[in-house]
Amino acid sequence: MKFLIVFCGLVGLSACFPSVFDEPDVLTDKMVEFINGQKTTWTAGHNFEYIPQERRYVHVKRLCGSLPQKHSPVKLEQKEVVVDMDLPDNFDSRVQWPMCPSLKELRDQSECGSCWAFGAVEAMTDRICISSKGAEKFHISAEDLLSCCSSCGMGCNGGYPSAAWSYFKRSGLVTGGQYNTHQGCRPYTLPHCDHHTTGQYMPCTGDLPTPKCSKTCEDGYNKTYSADKHYGVSVYSVSSDEQQIMAEIYKNGPVEAAFTVYSDFPSYKSGVYQHKSGSELGGHAIKILGWGVEDSTPYWLVANSWNADWGDKGFFKILRGQDECGIESEVVAGLPKL
């Protein structure tokens, strides 16, 4: 311990302090104060306060359900995007395609490691609307993908984004909105919960099991399960090249990506995130819907699935062009069959 104190004094607190964080400390005032004391591009704040301190670490790890692509049973062919246009410095899919309301929506994965499914169906939903020029505005069901794709992984215990897109092309997915919306064939059956603050939902109290695969639509829906299926015509991985990812979004809409979550990320509130401190919590899948530059720092604009109470109203920005936390290494997408 004496050596650690002396060493910190020699090399500076900012270089040594991250190593002394224990797992129970990662979502505390200590972490927030440390991040905000750095000269960095983002601001930390108090998230997950409604979760008891002794459960926060385990709760956030549970939400990180994207399994490493190297272990995936599905390897998608990489698509080379022809960058035949001048890409703008700033791009936001919500502005580019205002006729598609799903681009502005934030879903809630609840207490389930289903981020891999949410990142996929969110991008699929957006791309169907974009490809149809706003004619098709339904939601692809996270419930259907989570519960019925046996090759995708382990449901609420994690899955593979690449396998999710492969399933979309091979088996198709039905429609389904968020919990208690009664939208579509199979809405999400896991309830919203307050991960972060005392708010409008019930508190998150414990892990939830993967829903059972049901190949019937909820009562009152006007189609059969098989008639409600929607398919991808092509699915692929996208090069980790920054320009390739930008061109893919610019041409076809949001993509799904996965990155490594470290224990400082859950405290994000604003700015352009880059990892500063803490241990690895797991992989997390999200939807990238644009990019830009903030105070000379390039970023990706990302929609999370931890409801709108987290971060910057549910969204966040992360450093672009440096493969920050692996965000540019596992990008997948596809085109819908209309």
Per-region residue spans from a language model:
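Catalytic-core signature of thiol
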Residues: 2-8, 12-338
